[in-house]
């Protein structure tokens, strides 16, 4: 997709795509070592929840290019209805993270790989997130 087409997409559409990119990446990552399905699901949920994504968005910030930081900022400022169970700031950062991944998936797969690797390293060393009581 060319840059003009990417810029024509809504931030919500990029976040929609980025959500799928992140979910598939995490599902692939947790497959090894082989474990029971319930553990795979639990590990995946811990990594893809909004609070974990918001944490990643914050940690990625120093590693982003100017253009990527702009996509993250735009994603954070995008409109949308915040689910009642979530803090608005957390939801907006998670949406920003997803929008950035959606943008990179369309614009630069090599850079997407670098960003996903940084996310993996961060979650490996710091854990995905503290599970919420509702989960």
UniProtKB/Swiss-Prot annotation:
Annotated Gene Ontology cellular component terms: cytoplasm
Named cofactor requirement(s): Mg(2+)
Key words, A-Z: Cytoplasm, Endonuclease, Hydrolase, Magnesium, Nuclease, Ribosome biogenesis, RNA-binding, rRNA processing, rRNA-binding
Superkingdom as given in the UniProt entry: Bacteria
HAMAP family in the cross-refs: RNase_Mini_III
Residues annotated as signal peptide: none
Gene3D superfamilies linked to this entry: Ribonuclease III domain
Subunit structure: Homodimer.
Protein name according to UniProt: Mini-ribonuclease 3
Gene Ontology molecular function, alphabetical: ribonuclease III activity; rRNA binding
Localization annotation: Cytoplasm
One BP term from GO: rRNA processing
E.C. designation(s): 3.1.26.-
Function: Involved in correct processing of both the 5' and 3' ends of 23S rRNA precursor. Processes 30S rRNA precursor transcript even in absence of ribonuclease 3 (Rnc); Rnc processes 30S rRNA into smaller rRNA precursors.
The family this protein is said to belong to: Belongs to the MrnC RNase family.
């Amino acid at each position: 997709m060319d840059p003009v087409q990417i810029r024509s997409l809504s931030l919500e559409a990029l976040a929609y795509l980025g959500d799928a990119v992140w979910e598939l990446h995490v599902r692939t990552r947790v497959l090894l070592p082989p474990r029971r399905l319930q553990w795979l699901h639990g590990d995946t949920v811990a990594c893809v929840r909004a609070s974990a994504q918001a944490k990643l968005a914050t940690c990625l910030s120093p590693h982003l290019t100017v253009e990527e930081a702009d996509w993250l900022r735009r994603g954070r400022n995008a409109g949308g209805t915040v689910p009642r169970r979530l803090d608005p700031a957390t939801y907006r950062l998670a949406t920003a993270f997803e929008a950035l991944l959606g943008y990179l998936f369309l614009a630069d797969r090599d850079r997407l790989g670098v960003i996903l690797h940084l996310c993996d390293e961060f979650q490996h060393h710091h854990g995905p997130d503290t599970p919420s009581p509702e989960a």
